[in-house]
Amino acid sequence: MKKWTRICAAGILAFVLSACGQTAVPKENPITGEKEEVVVKSELTAGEVMKKANAAAETQQSMHSDMEILQTLEMGDEKQEITSTIDMDMILEPLAMRQTMNMQVGGEEMAIEQYMTEEGFFMKDPQSGRWVKLPNDMYKEVTGQMAGVTESPVDFSMYKEYAKDFIFEETHDEYVLTLEGSGEKFSELMKEMLGKNMPLGTDEAMPVEADMKVEKINLQFSIDKKTFFTKDFDMDMIMTMDEQGQKIKVTQNVTGTMTKINEVDEIKIPKEIIDNAQKMDSRTNQQ
């Protein structure tokens, strides 16, 4: 079950928008059914918005992100519910990150704090409360994995065949792209997303080839009309997977917001953490 939890988490930040050829229609209020008033209607097509969003993503060097993830994993009689919140600052060059993640698994709570800069990879042990400095080889491995994830939002090539499936709407200050789907077509999309974001050479990468079926997937992205940066996303998904004769059902909701884009200038590890962190070598990590 832990392996599948990691697989689900690996794809959280990999979902990006695609586009079709029509211009946007005013967004409909899901409760009242009324169309939102748009003062100046955009003449851009969804494809043009996608190209501009792609170009904007290439200029993105830093951001703050808040996410909430609700997951239920079922395998036979075993059921696991996981609730996670993530608060993160990230700079792409040189790659640096500050992250706080709170998880509730099976009634137990766990908080994980991390810093990663050129000074090293530091993590607060959720059990002891002490800071540890992880081995340099682990730092290199994690930065390599993160580099792949941070590059994925500007790779729109794998979404082209799903273009006609997106609903394209607009509000006064946002473009909204929504995808609702199910079946084999979207199962292949999920496999490609997970494959791009799983570390190569790990056991966790193998189940991506398992029999995966998307029963339901709803994605929604909001894009700022002025900057063309993606502001937030919402994903609901139900999928089943078979591995070695065992059926696993995953129900997942992920919501995320991206703010302070290109405004995070520095991520600095507090001096007391650097001075007092226990160094963990590869040997210690295996124990």
What are these regions (language model features)?
Residues 21-287:
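Subset-of-secretome marker
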Residues 16-19:
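C-terminal motif of bacterial Sec signal peptides marking the signal peptidase cleavage site
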Residues 1-8:
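Bacterial N-terminal signal peptides that target proteins for export
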Residues 8-9, 212:
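Short hydrophobic/aromatic segments of transmembrane alpha-helices and their interfaces
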